[in-house]
Amino acid sequence: MAEWIALDQLLLEARPQRSVGLCDGEVIDHAGFRQRVLAWRAAFAAAEGRDWALYFDDAVAFAAALFGAWHAGKRVFLAADNLPATLQALQPQVSGFAGDVSADYRSLVALDAALDDELQALDERACELCVFTSGSTGQPSAIGKRLDQLAREVEALQAAFGAQMEGVQVHGTVSHQHIYGLLFRVLWPLAA
């Protein structure tokens, strides 16, 4: 993997030589990813309410919306899936939805943003998300996480496994909508 970038500083400058991943079959470099984040930041900044639910099938699209929401000062709720019962249960807790959800939920869409828009470092203690347990022992329970907690997890992964990761591609079997997929499939590869 490439040079380490702390998650709170991930998008301060565009790095076109750095690959982020594939989105809809297209290779996305860091500069392109940053532009997607700016577009989502514009959308979330224009949207009322603090709490937004995200569900995306694609991990890169998800990551862009996640960082866009955080850069707009929003708290993110990760829906475990996009089934009607899940979205209906989540609806009273959030201001709206973004991503691959039924048209009934009027998903927020990314807006155009200038390529030269600036992004500030994220406040790791202010950026929040809420993940849900699987519900295997009852109803899914909400678990709040801050970016500083997620960043420490990612740093621990890098310390334990980073030396073995040079030049590898990351393939995930756990959805990025769940904590392990979020850490292993999205946040760690972005930082590394």
Regions found by a protein language model. Name each.
Residues 2-6, 11-16, 114-132, 163-171:
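Conserved pre-ATP/AMP-binding loop-to-beta segment of ANL
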Residues 54, 161-192:
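Conserved AMP-binding loop of ANL adenylate-forming enzymes
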Residues 52-53, 77-79, 91-101:
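Short, hydrophobic beta-strand segments that form beta-sheet elements in well-ordered domains
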Residues 42-82, 168-176:
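Conserved AMP-binding/adenylate-forming
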Residues 8-9, 15-46, 59, 145-148:
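Conserved AMP-binding/adenylate-forming core of the ANL superfamily
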Residues 29-30, 120, 128-155:
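Conserved AMP-binding A3 loop
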Residues 102-127, 144, 153-154, 159:
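Flexible, low-complexity linker/hinge segments
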